[in-house]
Amino acid sequence: MKKILCICLSSTLQRSISFKTVALEKVNRSEYYRYDASGKAVNSARVLTQLEKGCAVVACPLGERNLSLFTDLAARDNLELSYVTIPGSTRECWTLLDRTAGTTTEIVVSEPVLEADEDLKAVASAEIKLLKYINDVLPEVDAVLLAGSRPKIWSDDLYATLCGMTHDNGKIFLADYIGEDMKKTLAASIPDIIKINEEEFRATFPECNDQTLEQAIIRKSQELNNIIVITRGCDSTYAADHGQFYECPTEKVNPVNTTACGDSFNAGFLYEYLQTGDLDKALKKGTWCAARNAELETPGAIHA
């Protein structure tokens, strides 16, 4: 069995709330809701666990105030969870599902930024513990999936450090993040796989904006000597492997909850790529997982 370490610094408690309809500036009464342990890499880990139980392990920080809720939800989904605690609460995201319109609206409820000296010392200690755990487990896994934004309480170069640690252990690193974290990573150690969407690619590599997307990812993957995968919503997915271009059509589905479709794609893609080394098969598996996720209420799932 191939094993994947899923690292999530933006752990989330996801509340998916179902409405017959959602109307702005009105009182909206829900039909029901569900809670899930979430965050981009956590969602990917849930899909991986459904693909093959035991193939994924999650490393993440969790707020101490609502710790048990997150760990109970993770246990319900058979997630192998290794965590460090930090002051405060794990943030929540609320997904509003409009059954009539078939739309998904996500509200991210950010927690107050930790600024007290005592809290920051606790975070620094948690970061050391997290890095130690990751360093210890890297020899036991085949790849690392690092996805999502880095809260400002963590070291500026943490993502670059994690990519370097992964490569020092001879493992594959998939990066699903952008901005300064991606720039610092590229300056230190090139991710084997960069998977982002078209808007994120254009923002991260503005020097490519005078090229078509196909030309841009071909040239950038040649320059970086890696794999770049660009999802484009309902449109086909583009990819380039060291300059060789690939395209994979999406599946048409009747969506229930589109939250975590990208995370589900990451899971299927990396799972299949580790099994076969075949990029075309990996793109198809990622697409299949994203489509199955869209048909379900659970964020990051391929079956109920």
What are the language-model segments listed below?
Residues 1-25:
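Positively charged, low-complexity intrinsically disordered leader regions
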Residues 29-91:
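Substrate-binding N-lobe of the ribokinase-like
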Residues 95-140:
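Conserved phosphate-binding/catalytic loop of the ribokinase/pfkB sugar-kinase fold
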Residues 211-304:
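Conserved phosphate-binding/catalytic region of the ribokinase-like
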